[in-house]
Amino acid sequence: MKAGLLRTQFSYQNTVVREKMKEKTKESVSAVVPIMLIVLLLGFTMAPLSPSILVEFIVGAVLVIIGMVFFSLGAELSMTPMGERVGGSMLRTKKLWMIIAIGFILGVIITVSEPDLQVLAGQVAAVPNMVLILSVAVGVGVFLVVALLRILIGIPLAPLLLVFYAIVFALAMFVPKGFLAVAFDSGGVTTGPMTVPFIMALGVGISSIRNDKHAGNDSFGLVSLCSIGPILAVLILGMVYSTEGNFTTTAITEVSDSVELGKLFLYEIPEYLKEIALSLLPIVVFFGVFQIFAPKMNKKSLMKICVGLVYTYIGLVLFLTGANVGFIPAGNYLGSVLASLSFKWIIVPIGMIIGYFIVKAEPAVYVLMHQVEELTSGSISGKSMQISLSVGVAVSVGLSMIRVLTGVSILYFLIPGYGIALILTLFVPKIFTAIAFDSGGVASGPMTATFLLPLAQGACLAVGGNIVTDAFGVVAMVAMTPLITLQILGVIYRIKDSRRADVPQTVTPVVDMFAELSDDAIIEL
């Protein structure tokens, strides 16, 4: 009888995993296929692609889809429960020094583990790689501590953002132009697929221990504060190091047959196997040590996390291989061809269309959307968030292409953009502010770094611009505009909620995604 019960339980778990896999596959296909169709349409019309680049892109897209499926499922099974457990246990200790120490160490570890940071460090020739990586990691560690203390003390997020961004822009006035775009890019790059699931779950774990009505609001906001640390770190480095250094253009590898194509991808896979293993190892070691001192998990939960880590590992290896080998050359080539046309302005609307769809292919976006839906009981739907993010990224890519064509300083876009975003914090519910500033770091992930940035770099070379000052900054722009669009979503929510309050009690109002909860208590955990 016991054996039969175990078989039934095992069968049920397999069914759940299969259903989850189907759901993740559907999400991944719907996210990547539109990008494939856009690139193919351009390749067969105004921006002809060589057969080599085209086939590399298609194979890369398939790997990206498979990688997204495994990563999304793996993050849900491992990163999220690990983060929630660590966060809850930290608060239960009731020892401030321990919370500060663990928060700082954790911030440094997960930042050094972020694959995108390695890419950024390699592109900043003026600063030694290890110096940049450690500086950014310390920045994230410090601001993760600030974010944790904010949750514990109950400090509103908006005033902190106002103060820290005022410091950021004050420092920016004294930094050479060559460091500005890279500094703001670093804020988006470091909150990538490795960092976001863990940090967000950490916030959920800590806020869940609190019993007050604002605990749910405070589940968000950690990613937004952690994004500030890297910006400040690179700005400070800009005051120490010179801006001298050469930028290396992307090499496009031509393949003549299917054997060479296979070798091209297989040659890169061992590198990413090693890179992702080194990225995951510090987190696994930290959690293992944590398990020794914290109350033990049951074997079933621990096994689930181990399986999730394997899925995460496989997913990130496949995703980064496909994105780096297949997407970077295609993005770079498309940018150079479109910007070389007599009507080069066409790259602005085309960039906006690509930006609208490409954010859906960011792995961490789905982690954020699912967590928002779960914690708000569906009051803020994933679909409304996705549309807001897509519109924001579309606008940011359009503005980035205008920068590439005109050479206008990034500060002329960032200062008004962040100014508008910070002003909006005064008029929207607190949870929308926290989610909006979190989403900026989430939207600017590996797809931005491996397709949108090469697109801008290719266009910049074609028009004879400065790569460092004009092409870099795309990540920063992508991280900025969702702050505005998602808070506009909050304004819409507030208007709809006030209209609902004006409806007489005898009339049953139509309930939509923006009007399911009161304005003062959007979340009750």
Label the model's feature ranges.
Residues M1-S28, G83-W97, N211-L222, Y241-P270, ...:
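Intrinsically disordered, low-complexity non-transmembrane regions of multi-pass membrane transporters
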Residues E23-A31, V55-A61, S89-W97, L157-L162, ...:
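Alpha-helical transmembrane segments and their helix-start/interface "positive-inside/aromatic belt" motifs
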Residues V55-E56, G74, A121-I133, R150-A166, ...:
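Transmembrane helix-loop boundary segments of multi-pass membrane transporters
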Residues A31-M46, G60-F70, I102-I109, G139-R150, ...:
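Hydrophobic core segments of alpha-helical transmembrane domains in multi-pass membrane transport
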Residues E56-V59, T253-A364:
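Transmembrane helical segments that form the transport core of multi-pass membrane transport proteins
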Residues M1-R7, A147-L162, K177-G178, R210-V255, ...:
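Juxtamembrane and boundary regions of transmembrane helices in multi-pass small-molecule transporters
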Residues L41-V55, A75-E84, I109-V124, F143-G154, ...:
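Transmembrane helix-loop junctions in multi-pass membrane proteins
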Residues G87-S89, L96-I167, W345-T425:
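Helix-loop-helix junctions within the multi-pass membrane cores of secondary transporters/permeases
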